[in-house]
Amino acid sequence: MTFYNDLITSLLYTTAIFYIFKGLNRNKYLYFIISGIIIGINSFSRIPNILDYGIILLVILHALYYRETVCLCINRCLVFTVSFIIGIMGIISLMKVWGHYEPFVNNMRELLFIAEDDSGTSSHTLSNMIFAQVRIYYLVLKLGIKIVLLYIIFWGSAKYIKKEVVLLPVRIIVFSLLAILFYKENVVFTLCAFSMVGILGNIVLNKDKEIKMLSWAGLSMIMIIPLGSDGGMVNNGSIIYWLGMPMAISFYLSIQNIHIPAIPQWAVRQTLLLTLGIYILACGAKAICDGVYFDGGPLFEKRYSIQNDRVKHIYTSRERAQILNDLLIGIKPYIKQGDHLFAYGSIPAINYMTRTKPFIGCSWPELLGEPLFRHKLNNYSGPLPAILRQKFNSIGKEFGEPSENYLIDCGIETGPFRSNKKHRVINEFIEKNKYKTVFENQYFVLYLPEK
């Protein structure tokens, strides 16, 4: 497993939650200090993590549940807040010592520029970030409604159909539809739906205050961490459920101790067990038949590796491996380790594989909005980089068909990734600086400036 920013985010977040609960249970300010500093540090794993400061609400909720004094609550919040600021200032101080502060500030300026971009060619505008969350929760709600309707049919049939010969086919149909639903929907949506129901069930129905508090913590993790991602929780995957899922499971296991009106306890437990079994089978079938993230197709086809020391243990299909191996062999005579490589398209890993430096400080310049992209290229004054471009769309589970015309017209524009406006910007840069083609095949083309 790669130890990347989202994983670091979840690790530090759960650690901070652990210490804030120790502080609440033992009434020791030291733990609030540790928790606040960790949250401050975590703000630099991903900039949106600054919103993790919102876990201070757990201190307020604890005061409300346990009827603690306002003075005690305020003191805890102040200690946590000051510690949070200390964590941030500590990282900034280290940045200045190591010479990282100026690049960080420049990056922040660019992020603010991107957030305000209204050109329609940037993936991480503020409006896109907000809409992503709304869209995802809308899809989760739709899925939840479908599941509930199937449950109603299941429970209703058990109550009103007395003949087993009729009841059995109805149940088979219901759970077959449920299996199809789980297979077709995003796995993360299903996790979210079941986690939310379980967490909210604990918060509303469970009388144990500790369980309520832990459920609030799990809910905060699910709600906060996806903020700042253009794909919402889809991009974060299952790591946002480290707290929420255990609390949801605790609710489902405790149903026999909780009275739920109009639904027999045996029916709920039986349905949940069947649902869990179907979900596991559907996920297994999906993983085997439907491929993995950005690499569709049956899993047994992923037997071929890329001839590169850095990714040789990552397996893909024969076709994809061949495409990438041909690329690496073809560009090897023209670039060397430490060179600047301007890789335009959805191919940010090429800098990593070739040990080259990303041009304009970004390994995925396709994500930049057209105004910022144009500004960076027009104001660049250093040595000209090698330019690598792809002739096909690689976003999604399957590679698109290559086309010679793709370098000019990417066809149907899909959001911020495939944009003819940005194609014109890079074509102008190539023409202005008199680049020439040194390598080209069906899928890629490499340009070098004339000497």
Residue ranges and their predicted role:
Residues 387-451:
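Aromatic/acidic, Gly/Pro-rich catalytic loop(s) in extracytoplasmic/lumenal soluble domains
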Residues 285-368, 383-398, 442-447:
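Short periplasmic/luminal acceptor-recognition loop of GT-C membrane glycosyltransferases, typified by
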Residues 1-15, 45, 51, 186-195, ...:
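Multi-pass, polyprenyl lipid-linked donor-dependent membrane glycosyltransferases
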Residues 19, 31-49, 53-58, 86, ...:
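Membrane-interface alpha helices of multi-pass inner-membrane proteins
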